[in-house]
């Protein structure tokens, strides 16, 4: 049901300029005079993204890309957190079924340099969702040159080079992992130890609560412009999975305060979900016995 919405375009320029994290970069780099190499490469990549099946869109995980209707180098992206209940063999993740918004700007030297990417889902700068996802939105990823490891590869005669899609998939698969605590440099050696695993559970506990607040409740309250239909459809279709996941998270909460916080968030979330069901003509489910 979500497939036709995977790639789309919308107007991102408002009366006061672009409503985008990289609005200054956009203003400083007008389309007039944009290098042909950048435009040619972007045209190729966006054409591929628009092809059915190019972007991963499933209940387990999804990536939705929105380009500006006037500028192909201005993008917004929603990445859904990998769903715990649907991929048990890969382990639990604390991001399950949440929607995380990223802003992307493609600089003039592209594809010789990587795109610029910033996370917008941060609870207004209060939440660091991962050692690689800062509360100011910085994304630490080797492809972006902001983390150790193999960096961005410009295209050559024998290699097509790195792509925007690779960046987005890497965020979902390399950063949004079951145990993000161990992404922190120096903490990896603790993995498998009783103390390290306990710290990881406590870390995930806080992230689960933050995911419910900001990537589910707040996303439903204020869906990003252009993504409204995707957000509504995502949470309406996946409500049963979301509520089963929430019940499990509440049962596994490491502290009473976290458990109570999740229950409060669900109390605020339920009317929003009921409203989606009512608008779609669905039967509103009975209250989930979380506690």
Could you say what each language-model-derived stretch is?
Residues 1-97, 109-291:
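UBC/E2-like fold recognition across ubiquitin and ubiquitin-like conjugation systems
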């Amino acid at each position: 049901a979500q497939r036709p919405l995977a790639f789309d375009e919308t107007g991102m320029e408002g009366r006061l300029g672009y409503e985008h994290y990289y609005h200054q970069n956009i203003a400083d780099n007008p389309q007039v005079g944009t290098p042909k190499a950048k435009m040619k490469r972007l045209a190729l990549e966006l054409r591929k993204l628009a092809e059915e099946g190019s972007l991963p869109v499933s209940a387990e995980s999804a990536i939705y890309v929105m380009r500006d209707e006037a500028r192909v180098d201005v993008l917004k992206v929603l990445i859904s957190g990998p769903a715990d209940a649907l991929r048990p063999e890969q382990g639990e993740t604390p991001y399950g079924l949440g929607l995380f918004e990223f802003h992307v700007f493609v600089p003039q030297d592209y594809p010789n340099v990587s795109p610029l990417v910033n996370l917008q889902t941060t609870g207004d700068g209060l939440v660091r969702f991962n050692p690689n996802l800062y509360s100011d939105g910085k994304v630490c990823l080797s492809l972006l040159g902001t983390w150790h490891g193999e960096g961005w590869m410009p295209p050559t005669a024998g290699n097509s080079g790195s792509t925007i899609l690779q960046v987005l998939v890497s965020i979902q698969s390399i950063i949004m992992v079951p145990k993000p605590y161990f992404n922190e440099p120096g903490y990896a050696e603790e993995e498998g130890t009783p103390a390290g695993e306990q710290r990881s559970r406590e870390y995930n506990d806080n992230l689960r609560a933050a995911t419910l607040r900001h990537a589910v409740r707040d996303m439903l309250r204020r869906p990003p412009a252009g993504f409204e239909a995707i957000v509504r459809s995502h949470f309406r279709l996946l409500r049963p999975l979301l509520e089963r996941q929430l019940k499990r998270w509440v049962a596994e909460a490491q502290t009473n305060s976290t458990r109570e916080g999740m229950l409060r968030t669900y109390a605020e979330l339920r009317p929003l979900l009921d409203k989606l069901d009512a608008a779609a003509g669905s039967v509103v489910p009975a209250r989930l016995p979380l506690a």
